[in-house]
């Protein structure tokens, strides 16, 4: 049991190391990994307390999605610096390149964790990396999943990701106040997100 705990601790540290490496390449992200991980934790715990998807959002699920959240942008390793670190808005072509980070992220997770015996963790890590840009109305990427087709873990990750993007400063935009960011997300319920309002 002690050996298993040591392995899990080492795995967690390795994951955070990889996540921080990605973040260090992208000056736009700032504390994105840490922020989104905290938001995912808050959302997952609140959803569990509210009895949302009780058959899915268990105590184990909350722990797994918290630990998987830092890997959601791991696929950005595959994106060239000239695009990833661009301080201005991306062109249509550049955005198409950015979009591949979701599928690349899923592939990387399966490769990195192929020797891991924790299949539930691999599944959730794969989901948050691959599907956190899917939208409830089917207009997201990479697969254009609709509604309930989108894994719950990815839906939670999506809200955390968008909330952090809205409240962070960019060269081309000022941060939205938290209240306004929540209002924007709530207004998009049923279109970009599932019809349950964010639980901050």
Language-model features, listed with the residues they occupy:
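Histidine- and acidic-residue-rich, metal-dependent catalytic cores
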Residues: 13-200
